[in-house]
From Swiss-Prot:
Biological role stated in the UniProt entry: Part of the ABC transporter complex MalEFGK involved in maltose/maltodextrin import. Probably responsible for the translocation of the substrate across the membrane.
Protein name per its UniProtKB record: Maltose/maltodextrin transport system permease protein MalF
Family, as annotated: Belongs to the binding-protein-dependent transport system permease family. MalFG subfamily.
Assembly, per entry: The complex is composed of two ATP-binding proteins (MalK), two transmembrane proteins (MalG and MalF) and a solute-binding protein (MalE).
Naturally occurring in which organism (per UniProt): Vibrio vulnificus (strain YJ016)
Residue numbers on the Periplasmic membrane side: 46-49, 105-288, 346-378, 458-492
Amino acid sequence: MQSVQGTDAMTAPAASLPGSKKVFIKWALLGTVGLINGYATILMYSRGEVAFAMLTVILTALALYVFGSKKTYAHRYIYPGIAGMILFILFPLAYTVGLAFTNYSAKNQLSLDRAQSVLLDRTFQSGESYPFTLYKTDSGHRIVIKDGDVLLSTPEFVLGSAISDLDLSPVDTVSGTAEPIKTIVSNRTALSSIDLHFANGDDIRMSGLRKFAGVVPLYTMQADGETLKNNQTGELLKPNMDVGFYQAMDEAGNFVGNTVSPGFVVQIGTDNFERVWKDDGIKEPFISIFIWTVVFSILTVLLTLMIGLVLASVVQWEELKGRAIYRVLLILPYAVPAFISILIFKGLFNQSFGEINMVLNALFGISPSWFSDPIMAKSMVLIVNTWLGFPYMMILCMGLLKAIPEDLYEASAIDGANFVQNFTRVTLPLMIKPLTPLLIASFAFNFNNFVMIQLLTQGGPNMIGTSEPAGYTDLLVSYTYRIAFEGGGGQDFGLASAIATLIFLLVGALALLNLRFTKLSQN
């Protein structure tokens, strides 16, 4: 009995060892993940990316809790999906909505502190300039400037070291080899950080690739910590929190004159949304593009459904020979990547050399302006998008037609129903319910079909007299892209975010209406 107990006691630690290893490995991995993400969070926060730092903290803390606690064991399987939804849907959505209430643009990207430091680093030439030559010596380099007929040289120094101050002294001759301009260009940063001192106390700094000059700061920070004094003109500048720029002030304390770049990001409330409705140069194209977006989405869904349903009915016809070949040929447009098909059609519709215009000109003597006429451009977009979308609808309809019992058609034939009555009273009612969610999804996809517009027409032909770039074939999503990245007056991310927020609300409202309508029709 004692020997049995002794054996159990000896085998107990060995049995528990694998479990201990698993626990150790688990916490080692979790600790490593926590340390890496913690370090990344510190880096992001130190660089001013507070939103991304907070996102990293939330996802990391959630991961450590889910994978470290036994209570949340079941949630480990859904955490990747939840994390992906937060990372790729909720965070971009919240970030975009947040930008919509700021003046964030190509001109206003920095924080106030960063804009101040950029302005304080600016200098202007306040005195005489002196040509210089960089000489390479046996133990380093020396800078030689020419003051009239006098040569002044610095002591030898190591280029690229931490030296920032050098004294000038007269020399009769210069030893060493003059460096070429490419050496000065490659070491411009190091040379620009060196101050040269004359014997009388004057200082000069590098002001060009061949000159040193007396350089002083253009702006000086005042005692209040935010006012800048222009040392060249004497005017005072303060940050204008309404526009996000430093601007001069008059004696009464009012902002006057032009703003000084770079700008900084400020909260401007609903100004971007008000611009959409109050600025006719934005409102009119926005309304026009919104109407076209809805029409484009609806017509695309209807045309692809009609063509797909007709072709599905044809290839399902048992008396048709070679049905398998026809199915393969009709599905091919769906198998070819969309961007390749779009670029091919762009060449086919070329107004001067495209095959489509060549055929139309040979048969009817016409050459439509597919890319310069708004109506023809919209027609071309619908034609190409229908070509890309009908195979998908055909595949869906083929499956749904197979699911309809043949007994229903036999019963309708006994009642004397013709083909049209079979379609409207048997086929369509049985197909429309399972098709409705897919049609809604197709509508939502085409509502934001950016790739189609960008590759085929790039939104053109352009509208005339608009404040922001807009085209007749632009969808709301491509219109937003052009405002954000192709604006003639600079990239306006705040306005683009406001329009993107409106698009989100519009698509959400349309989706709710469609779902309500679907539920009512089913009831």
